[in-house]
Design a protein with these regions (language model features):
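Flexible, gly/pro- and Lys/Arg-enriched active-site loops
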Residues: 45-52, 70, 74-78, 82-163, ...
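Residue-level signal for short, function-critical loop segments
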Residues: 9-10, 163
Length: 250
């Protein structure tokens, strides 16, 4: 049996009852539910997401493999009325597989640990209640340690243009001046060469295409706090930075 961390979310009404139904279904399907957090009201991330969310976390013991468990979570979403019409849109129930023991996996459709979990306040606020000791193998930190890094007043985030974006005329002058969004300051990381900056995170922006996931880890993952964002244009990049700031600060 493998200890797994699951995130629950929803914002179309009745989320509390759907969370309970999902937990009961997972327990009945052969996974053993060890702990469930309180429900937290959180801000929606992105204009398409709709109104505020209810979020929670659960710890399971599962005899299934990671792909089997992912398919089981998606089946429970469907039973609870989830319709996948709009990516990042409003939803009745969202079940995300965050951690599968200390497994690391990088495949189309399943990346473990979840690439964006470590900077999302709406994920960690509930996860720390039930899984503070669970380990993020890529960052080499516990959930409790990741949560503590969100409990600061200001966040400096370095932004790098990667691949063709670095040479793109569309992105000429992009983020020449730091972008302040609430408590989060986004700065081009190249501007800080030779300057010691205690980055909360680094974002690597790459050109999006239809094959891309929304986020990923860099190929050569150095163990630092780096996230790849796939963007379509400077305007889309700025929107994703604003969404990232909302995810960090809640």
């Amino acid at each position: 049996m493998v200890r797994c961390l699951i995130a629950l979310g929803g914002n179309l009404g009745g989320s509390e009852l759907l969370f309970q139904r999902a937990i009961e279904q997972l327990d009945a399907d052969g996974d053993r539910v060890l702990a469930v957090s309180r429900n937290f009201e959180t801000r929606a991330v992105g204009e398409q997401a709709g109104g505020g969310f209810l979020n929670a976390a659960a710890v399971l013991e599962s005899a299934a493999g990671p792909w089997q468990l992912l398919q089981r979570l998606q089946a429970v979403e469907s039973v609870c009325g989830r319709e996948r019409m709009l990516r990042w849109g409003p939803r009745t129930l969202d079940l995300d597989l965050l951690l599968f023991g200390e497994s690391e996996q990088w495949e189309s459709g399943l990346i473990l640990p979840h690439p964006a979990m470590w900077l999302r306040r709406f994920v960690l606020s509930s996860a720390v209640e039930v899984a503070g000791d669970m380990w993020h193998p890529r960052l080499g930190q516990s959930i409790d340690q990741l949560w503590q890094q969100l409990c600061v007043p200001q966040f400096a985030v370095g932004v790098e243009l990667s691949g063709e974006l670095a040479e793109s005329a569309d992105f000429a002058g992009f983020l020449e001046q730091p972008l302040q969004h609430g408590a989060v300051s986004f700065q081009r990381s190249v501007a800080a060469v030779g300057v010691a900056v205690n980055w909360f995170a680094r974002l690597q922006l790459r050109r999006a295409d239809l094959r891309n996931p929304p986020w990923s880890y860099p190929e050569a993952y150095p163990g630092d706090r780096t996230l790849v964002l796939f963007v379509r244009s400077p305007e889309n990049a700025l929107e994703q930075l604003r969404q990232t700031a909302t995810a960090i600060t809640g």
